[in-house]
Amino acid sequence: MTKLTVRGLQVALASKNIVSNIDLEVSVGQWTCIIGPNGAGKSSLLKALAGIIPSTGEILIDGANMRDLSHRDRACWIAYVAQEPVMPTGMRVFDYVLLGRTAHLKMLATESPKDLEITHYVISELDLVEFIDRDIATLSGGERQRVAIARALTQASPIILLDEPTTALDVGYQQEVLELIDKLRNEKKIAVISTMHDLTVSGLYPDRLLLLAQGHVVASGSAESVLTPENIAQHYGAKVSVINHASGPVVIPERNN
């Protein structure tokens, strides 16, 4: 069973620690969501786990050092979607999503019927069929975000890192994307680590929340144990009510006057 293990992870920028002493363990089939105020280090943590920015400490995949892997091998293990994905212009949506299969191809090989089948499946599940021949440059922000997520899911890596995957999406597409990720992590046994700003949504699908503040984990556990008025007041500076619902805690901002 694939497992991502992180021990004592630190990320420094200009000699200042922006992520400090992070310990984390996520197995396939599990979903951990990282929350926290702006500047807490959420995106930096995900970039470090993806190997995009330098870090110290251990990042292990099934006990093997991730930093020893080639870029191709790393892509077979980990898929990453940035908060604002950079996409090439002049490329069709289908061809971009198909790039997710590149890590699985042998040298000089072309995509197999299975690769094409996987790509068509993900495009269909994310309601992108009508855009299949569109140039990526012509898409809206929300459409581009769904296409980026589709490429990552087509990659079929056992670990997927999603930085604010639903920020540019309306509520209908938010639900569609999160439902598909939840379905695949259960059916295909994928380990998911995401960041989210919407506290209510963060408690709907993940098994575990990590609350980050000033680069440190200040709370972790179930949504019910982390999403408390006290935690939110202390680390977000916000006055809220939290209502228990069958789907998870509902966080409602309160007026101060």
Predicted regions and their residues:
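Conserved ABC ATPase signature
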Residues: 135-139, 143
